[in-house]
């Protein structure tokens, strides 16, 4: 019986990341060995464009495959509506989906939109999305820093 090995899907979203700031895209001034290693074992987009130059709409587009106005996230500090599905909600159940980092599409503290593994890093955005009783919860990153 052949075992089908599914590929890992890893998306890395960075802020203020221009094409000319990564070594694998030809920059010879900035060393990015970890990103170069990922590029060597994967693929590099050579003709990619963002749908919007600000964080939340761009993230919504990449996670949902929809234009910002269709995903109903036309600006920052707009929560991704529950009826808009992300890639984590569209892949089969045998994938474990995790999100680590800055979400900017809703509450930063609690798992949502199909992601079951969740490490939030932005406490300041709770004010935009959390109910007041949830403001007592702090991000995993906050707890990590306190433990240091």
Predicted regions and their residues:
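Formylglycine-dependent sulfatase
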Residues: 1-148
């Amino acid at each position: 019986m052949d075992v089908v090995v599914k590929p890992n899907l890893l998306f890395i979203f960075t802020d203020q990341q221009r094409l000319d700031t990564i070594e694998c895209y030809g920059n010879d001034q900035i060393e990015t060995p970890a990103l170069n290693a990922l590029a060597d074992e994967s693929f590099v987009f050579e003709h990619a464009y963002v749908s919007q130059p600000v964080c939340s709409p761009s993230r919504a587009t990449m996670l949902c495959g929809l234009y910002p106005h269709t995903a109903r996230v036309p600006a920052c500090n707009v929560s991704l509506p529950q009826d808009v599905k992300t890639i984590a909600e569209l892949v089969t159940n045998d994938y474990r989906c995790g999100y680590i980092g800055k979400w900017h599409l809703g509450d930063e503290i609690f798992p949502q939109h199909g992601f079951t593994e969740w490490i939030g890093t932005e406490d300041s955005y709770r004010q935009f999305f959390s109910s007041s009783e949830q403001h007592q919860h702090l991000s995993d990153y906050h707890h990590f820093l306190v433990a240091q």
